[in-house]
Regions:
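Glycine-rich Rossmann NAD(P)(H)-binding loop
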Residues: 161, 188-193, 221-228, 237-239, ...
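Substrate-positioning beta->alpha
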Residues: 167-175, 188-211, 218-219
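Mid/C-terminal beta-alpha module of Rossmann-like enzyme folds, strongest
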Residues: 209-268, 329-332
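Amphipathic terminal alpha-helices
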Residues: 294-332
């Protein structure tokens, strides 16, 4: 099949591109910037379409010669993006897969684990990131119902490969570097809530089975590991992977976390202090033999090893460091 990835070499999508190539698909990547300083090298088998996806007319012209069996969009973040995607691809693809987020599930303290039919947030009661994903989903569902737009919605959980999952901070190398420099690692709340930490290679193994699958049209799926770990456990695994023996950890009280001036919106921070666990029945009906195979210990080692392959991979963000330092000083 001819498959287009919009994006295609990011933290989640690189492995999806790789898996699609391994399955024998003819893979195209649409992107305006092919720099790979903090990303993995683009697989040589992928064919490149260079265009600024945010420029509708430019992208329309770039795609004019093509038709696809499936389009996988990893960089659709708001309703305008969704509306443009519908216009661009409604006559160009047999399937369009939108990468949403499990953060759209309303945290109601009941009905765990979450299923695809769990209540979703209203777009106006949450931060822009979550609200915009909700708006996108609604736009695609409406297009499916009114125009038969061939939508499949996929909601990843916390998924990592080239990023480092931390409870408080950002997904760059700033927090690991602080720990290596002897600074404490911050954990939101008590750190005992159950969470899913999914390696991108495992996500991709399920995701690629949705490509070209007619049973997935008009459906939504979340994809996460079946293994649940706490942030305390994950944080200790990170410190072990960094070979830090003199571990320093500070737990920031629940109410205080929501007041912190950090890059992550407060409602996403709130979700990181709650149980985030998911029922995988629906994806396993499509991919019956799938299960996540990479443990957090193996996955973190793979990530840290890759980060140390090049200095460019290890982004240290001064603004993040300053904000984390201010929080740390308050609780030391």
């Amino acid at each position: 099949m001819k498959v287009l990835f919009v994006g295609g070499y990011g933290n989640i999508s690189w492995w999806c591109t790789k898996r699609a190539i391994e399955k024998g698909h003819e893979v195209y990547l649409l992107n305006r910037d092919l720099k790979t300083g903090t990303r993995k090298e683009i697989p040589s088998e992928a064919k490149i379409i260079v265009s600024d996806y945010r420029n509708f007319e430019e992208t329309k012209d770039a795609l004019e010669p093509y038709e696809f069996d499936c389009v996988c969009d990893f960089i659709c973040f708001n309703k305008e993006h969704a509306t443009n995607a519908i216009k661009l691809f409604k006559d160009k693809t047999k399937q369009y897969i939108f990468i949403s987020s499990e953060s759209v599930y309303k945290r109601t303290f009941k009905g765990l684990p979450y299923t695809e039919s769990s209540e979703k947030y209203n777009e106006d009661e949450v931060s822009d990131y979550i609200g915009d994903k909700v708006r996108c989903e609604k736009a695609f569902i409406e297009a499916f119902e009114k125009e038969n737009f061939p939508i499949t919605i996929v909601r990843p959980g916390l998924t990592y490969d080239t990023i480092v999952p931390v409870s408080i901070g950002h997904n760059c190398f700033t927090i690991p570097q602080r720990c290596l420099d002897g600074k404490p690692l911050l954990i939101a709340g008590e750190g005992n809530a159950l969470y899913t930490f999914t390696h991108s290679s495992d996500f991709a193994s399920a995701f690629v089975e949705l490509i070209g699958n007619k049973k997935a049209i008009g459906e939504d799926f979340h994809i996460t590991t079946q293994t649940w770990r706490t942030w305390n456990e994950a944080s200790n695994v990170l410190l072990d992977t960094l070979k830090i023996t003199n571990k320093k950890i500070i737990h920031i009280p629940f109410d205080e976390v929501l007041k912190l001036d950090l890059p992550m919106p407060s409602d996403l921070m709130y979700q990181r202090m709650l149980h985030n666990i998911f029922d995988l029945t629906k994806i396993r009906k499509i991919v019956p033999n799938w299960e996540a195979k990479v443990s957090i210990e193996e996955g973190y080692k793979m990530t840290i090893d890759w980060l140390y392959e090049s200095d460019k991979h290890r982004r240290f963000v001064d603004n993040v460091n300053q904000k984390i330092e201010a929080v740390t000083n308050k609780y030391i």
